């Protein structure tokens, strides 16, 4: 069962102290069991347990476990239920939760829903101190926590939390789940001083002395990863298990700052007697698998019309980019390069960003009410861009110009529709994947409301298996990441894969697959031969039986 955690948590908060009436159906079944610690199996007295009807979001109930961790919900109609639990030191979580998926509880005749052992996973935490080369605390440093998961089907390291160090240089991340984490710190030396173009000229006697002093203070901290790496490839992973307490102290090392001058060729505008600049070039760097992060320690200013200067940047490899002024087509640009010492770049010598526009045609069903968005996701950086669909069926990404790269394209807020065809001018299409090199791109998208559904049962030795990872694998998986579907088999072994575009697929069920690169064709190959092939046409509903591997 796929989790709808945001909705579930909001509902739980709204329903505190309340029990919504049961849906109108024959009642008489129970969900009962014991809440325990996942490692020690110690009963958790006072744990909070909630259920939500999968097909009726208005129905929910909440109880508190007794002195021996027992809980019970009675007089329930047959159906599927989401089971959630929390306690002191245990964040809210689903039953056998894996990322956004968990085991749903099936209730009905001949189904055992009364002997549940709900193993809550204790919170973990990471704390530490950020210091400089002399062991002094670095105050007000920005500390970022990254987690590596396989939620996208391949290793993906993304920021999950951030914190600011206190006056002792300390930070804390609490209420963490098990997993692999990395800590990074961005800061500016408190004593750093950077050249100011507005300062008055100095005398011949003062200039050499001040120049020497400024050289000593013209420094920056690189983005630093635990324990003291200046590149994410050298970061040490913190592998947390339930209830772990990890310490990650980080030492920052000051280095001579880069001086970057960017000439955009843009002329300033004047309005009401004031000079108006159209924003600053952005300075970013890639970390881990390609995630883009802004350089928060940099300090930029406009030296003159069309010229920008940056200080406070440590030597390294960066991306400098700027959107087109005033939304002019083909005006945006980017450049990835190594920076050290004093560097000047000219916008006219840099590759252009792409200006993406297009149309969307909806087939097979009326257009849903409300706003609809077209989403572009960069395969390398995971950067997501959104453009709103107009009432006339057009969209425009020109205000957030697109970097060259490979993109997946999907719809958001268009329930019941999936993109089936993509036509592009100025870009290359490979099935459901878009390869953009720059310049002007026009897209023609067709989305269909004729979507199917695949229901099934995961089996092991001809018996239903709960908690298996179910993966719907499309043909040519590399070019069709948006067609993958996943679920976790429920307590009766059943699963449901919704909003499936017609086509040929293979359904596989994996007993211990949650840490696999499930979208990698090489990883999938050994499992596909024992999967269940399906050929979905139109809005058909199929029922399949899948052997757990």
Where in the sequence are the language-model features?
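Long luminal/extracellular ectodomains of secretory-pathway precursor proteins
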Residues: 2-549
């Amino acid at each position: 069962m796929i989790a709808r955690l945001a909705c579930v948590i909001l509902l739980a908060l709204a329903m505190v102290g309340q029990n919504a009436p049961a849906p109108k159906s024959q009642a008489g079944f129970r969900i009962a069991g014991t809440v325990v610690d996942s490692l020690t199996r110690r009963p958790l007295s006072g744990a909070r347990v909630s259920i939500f009807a999968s097909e009726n979001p208005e129905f929910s109930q909440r109880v508190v476990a007794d002195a021996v961790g027992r809980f019970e919900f009675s007089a329930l109609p047959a159906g599927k239920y989401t089971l959630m639990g929390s306690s002191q030191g245990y964040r809210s979580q689903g039953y056998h939760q894996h990322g956004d998926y968990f085991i749903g509880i099936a209730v009905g005749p001949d189904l055992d829903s009364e002997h549940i052992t709900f193993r809550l996973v204790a919170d973990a935490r990471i704390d530490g101190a950020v210091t400089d080369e002399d062991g002094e605390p670095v105050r007000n440093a920005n500390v970022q926590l990254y987690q590596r998961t396989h939620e996208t089907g391949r290793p993906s390291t993304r920021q999950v939390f951030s914190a600011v160090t206190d006056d002792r240089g300390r930070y804390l991340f609490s209420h963490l789940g098990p997993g692999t984490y990395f800590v990074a710190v961005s800061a500016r030396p408190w004593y750093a001083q950077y050249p100011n173009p507005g300062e008055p000229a100095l005398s011949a006697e003062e200039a050499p002395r001040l120049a020497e002093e400024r050289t000593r203070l013209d420094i920056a901290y690189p983005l630093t990863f635990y324990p003291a790496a200046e590149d994410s490839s050298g970061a040490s992973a913190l592998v947390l298990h339930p209830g772990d307490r990890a310490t990650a102290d980080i030492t920052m090392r000051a280095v001579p700052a880069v001086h970057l001058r960017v000439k955009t060729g843009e002329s300033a505008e004047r309005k009401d007697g004031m000079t108006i600049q159209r924003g600053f070039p952005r300075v970013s760097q890639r970390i881990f698998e390609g995630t883009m992060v802004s350089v928060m320690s940099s300090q930029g200013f406009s030296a003159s019309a069309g010229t920008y200067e940056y200080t406070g940047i440590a030597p390294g490899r960066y991306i400098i980019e700027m959107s087109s002024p005033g939304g002019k087509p083909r005006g945006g640009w980017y450049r990835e390069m190594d920076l050290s010492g004093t560097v000047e770049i000219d916008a006219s010598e840099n590759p252009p960003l792409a200006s993406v526009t297009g149309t969307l045609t909806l087939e097979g069903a009326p257009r849903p009410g409300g706003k609809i968005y077209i989403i572009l996701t960069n395969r390398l950086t995971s950067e997501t861009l959104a453009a709103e669909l107009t009432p006339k069926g057009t969209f425009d990404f020109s205000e957030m110009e697109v970097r060259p790269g490979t993109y997946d394209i999907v719809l958001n807020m268009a329930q019941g529709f999936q993109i089936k065809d993509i036509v592009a001018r100025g870009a290359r299409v490979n099935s459901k994947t878009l390869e953009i090199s720059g310049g002007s791109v026009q897209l023609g998208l067709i989305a269909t409301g004729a979507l199917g559904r695949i229901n099934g049962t995961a089996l092991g030795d001809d018996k239903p298996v709960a908690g298996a990872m179910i993966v719907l694998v499309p043909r040519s998986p590399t070019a069709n990441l948006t067609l993958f579907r996943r679920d976790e088999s429920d307590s009766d072994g059943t699963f449901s894969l919704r909003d499936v575009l017609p086509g040929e697929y293979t359904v596989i069920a994996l007993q211990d697959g949650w840490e696999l690169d499930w979208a990698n064709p090489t990883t999938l190959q050994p499992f596909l031969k024992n999967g269940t092939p399906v050929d979905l046409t139109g809005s058909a509903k199929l029922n399949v039986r899948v052997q757990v591997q």
